């Protein structure tokens, strides 16, 4: 979600446990390069004014944390209603079930996307795009069953790049990967 927010000049917020509507608004205000005000209504008005002037996509990561706080979810709906800015919710596998409790909100979703495990071709594309060290197809095929979550993959790429630089590796072959993993 953070990567998408950066790519599309959006607003990225990571929801936190016990996050209130006030806290959420303060975070959005900060993302809009404003100083949060004392009154919640002032913060809401700043968000609306700034987003009407310069519309941006809002990405809310870990939306699961907000599912038990009706007012916070309604605040997001109000922001969308007033600004018409798209809001992307990113959550765990059962978040759509939790969101169904908010019928008037759930009906507004244009699309619900469930991310499945990466295929070998997907993994190769990720490694080709993010790693400075090339990987053979065979090495990617070996990695595939063991590392299939994006965060895991990013951590693995980082660790393998450090190892490659420390050990003069210019390309990861199956034999090398097999010895490391």
Report the location of each language-model feature:
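Conserved nucleotide-binding/hydrolysis micro-motifs of P-loop NTPases
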Residues: 17-20, 65, 93-97, 118-123
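Central P-loop NTPase core of STAND/AAA+ ATPases
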Residues: 30-54, 66
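P-loop NTPase Walker A phosphate-binding motif
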Residues: 1-10
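Sensor-1/coupling segment of RecA-like P-loop NTPase cores
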Residues: 79-103
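Conserved NTP-binding/hydrolysis module of P-loop NTPases
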Residues: 9-11, 21-38
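Conserved P-loop NTPase "ATPase switch" module shared by AAA+ and STAND
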Residues: 48-72, 86, 91
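C-terminal alpha-helical "lid" subdomain
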Residues: 2, 104, 116, 121, ...
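A short helix-turn-beta junction within AAA+ P-loop NTPase domains corresponding to the substrate/partner-engaging
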Residues: 9-10, 101-117
């Amino acid at each position: 979600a953070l990567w998408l927010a950066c790519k599309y000049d959006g607003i990225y917020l990571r929801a936190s446990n016990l996050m209130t509507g006030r806290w959420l608004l303060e975070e959005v205000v900060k993302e809009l390069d404003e100083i949060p005000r004392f009154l919640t209504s002032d913060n809401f008005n700043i968000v609306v004014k700034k987003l009407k002037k310069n519309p941006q996509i809002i990405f809310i990561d870990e939306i699961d944390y907000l599912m038990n706080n009706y007012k916070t979810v309604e605040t997001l709906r109000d922001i969308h209603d007033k600004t018409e800015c798209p809001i992307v919710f990113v959550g765990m596998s059962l978040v759509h079930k939790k969101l169904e409790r908010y019928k008037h909100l759930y009906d507004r979703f244009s699309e619900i996307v469930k991310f499945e495990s990466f295929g070998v071709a997907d993994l190769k594309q990720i490694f080709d795009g993010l790693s400075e060290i090339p990987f053979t197809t065979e090495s990617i095929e070996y990695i595939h069953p063991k590392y299939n979550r994006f965060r895991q993959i990013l951590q693995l790429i980082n660790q393998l790049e450090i190892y490659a630089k420390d050990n003069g590796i210019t390309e990861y072959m199956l034999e090398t990967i097999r010895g490391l993993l």
